[in-house]
A protein has these predicted regions:
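Generic recognition of flexible, low-complexity loop/linker segments
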Residues: 37, 149-152, 219, 257, ...
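Long, contiguous hydrophobic alpha-helical segments, chiefly transmembrane helices and signal peptides
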Residues: 47-49, 68-70, 161-165, 198-203, ...
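Aromatic- and carboxylate-enriched substrate-binding clefts and catalytic-loop regions
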Residues: 235-339
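N-terminal accessory beta-strand-rich subdomains and adjacent acidic, glycine-rich linkers
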Residues: 1-182
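An acidic-aromatic substrate-binding cleft motif
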Residues: 157-230
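Conserved aromatic-histidine-acidic binding/catalytic patches
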Residues: 39, 207-211, 245
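Short, flexible loop/turn elements at secondary-structure junctions
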Residues: 30, 42-44, 72, 167, ...
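Short loop/turn segments at secondary-structure transitions that flank enzyme active sites
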Residues: 57, 74, 169, 206, ...
Length: 339
């Protein structure tokens, strides 16, 4: 099967994307007649594969036995597991890592002047994958996120794409759009309202700046002077440096601030956390109230998870925000896999 299509995105690396690949599917059945397909794609800049089950009923998946073995002298840049992905990518030679460890995607490798980035794409109805490795071993094992040692796979289940981006230089990896190409198209045809950009972030310099409209207006002025696009709140939207507060609901000057920002072509992100937004009623209230106040985006915090629930929440929150033409910024967040 040949794939050859073009598409556009509201933002990204290029004005037009080309998705061109050769695809082949290998079909297997076990003695019980259960079906397994392995779908493989070859691109100019990498390869990817996924598993597809022929299950007609929900099934529980407990393990995945996928492994990837590299040369022991391979140089790697990868993050040790941490729930909020706020860590570093130290350079390490693969077979010199002397302790058992779990790592997060993406994993960048260099061996024999060949660069490769290992990651995954299209993760919507399953937990994200991590990698585990034994001491001095050059073999990675795919493991599911900690919260989902077992999860329920819906009928006709498809895994994420196991993705390998390759190039002779690091620029080939950086410029690749393989993850985008492996994802399905959006359900939204109207994307003209999407305005990505740089944000002024008052909390970084003054974690109580959110309490004072005059201070926030100065940050709006800064954003306008710097030709940035956004002002972004952080913990909390109003009046406390800690977790979510309901006080913002009664603050009268938020519409004045957003109107002032719009006069200078600056849009404003609000802030809240998953414990408020993990149900539709909570999202409906916050999203609709934000729009009434003139806020054009929301920063969603403290997801801290790669579970199936967390991956599906991100997709749901983005879809519901998009219906209101509202941007979403996730904080302490997993890597981009396509949502």
């Amino acid at each position: 099967k040949t794939i050859n299509e073009t598409y556009t995105l509201p933002t990204g690396k290029r004005s037009e994307y080309v998705n061109k690949a050769n695809e082949r599917t290998f079909v297997y059945r076990n003695a019980a007649g259960q079906l397994l397909k392995i779908v493989c794609r070859a691109y100019d800049d990498g390869v990817a594969f996924r598993y597809e089950l022929g299950n007609q009923e929900p099934v529980t998946i407990r393990h995945e036995l996928t492994e990837c073995t590299l040369a022991g002298e391979t140089h790697t840049w990868m993050m040790d597991w941490i729930k909020d992905y706020e860590n570093f990518y130290p350079e390490r030679v693969l077979d010199t890592i002397t302790r058992p460890a779990e790592f997060l995607f993406p994993v960048l490798t260099l061996q024999d002047k060949q660069w490769m980035l290992m990651t995954e794409a299209e993760v919507y109805s399953m937990p994200a994958m991590h990698l585990s490795k034994e001491p001095k071993s050059a073999t990675f094992h795919n493991v599911y996120a900690h919260e989902d040692s077992a999860f329920v796979a819906e009928p006709s289940f498809k895994t994420s794409w196991k993705t390998f981006i390759m190039g002779r230089n690091i620029g080939d990896v950086v410029e690749s759009s393989l993850v985008e190409n492996l994802n399905p198209s959006t359900d939204f045809s109207d994307t003209d309202w999407i305005k990505p950009g740089v944000a002024a972030f008052p909390w970084w310099g003054n974690y109580l700046a959110n309490s004072y409209i005059d201070t926030l207006k100065m940050y709006v002025d800064l954003a306008a002077e710097m030709n940035w696009e956004w002002l972004e709140f952080d913990v909390s939207l109003i009046n406390t440096p800690f977790h979510s507060s309901k006080e913002w609901e009664d603050v009268t000057w938020i519409p004045e601030l957003t109107a002032y920002a719009k006069e200078k072509n600056i849009l404003v992100y609000g802030w809240d956390e998953i414990k408020v937004l993990d149900n539709k009623a909570g999202r409906d209230f916050v999203f609709d109230r934000y729009k009434e106040m003139g806020l054009d985006g929301i920063k969603i915090d403290y997801i801290d998870s790669d579970s199936k629930y967390a991956m599906m929440f991100r997709d749901t929150a983005c879809a519901e925000a998009a219906k209101r033409k509202m941007m979403v910024s996730f904080h302490g967040e997993t890597l981009p896999r396509g949502h």
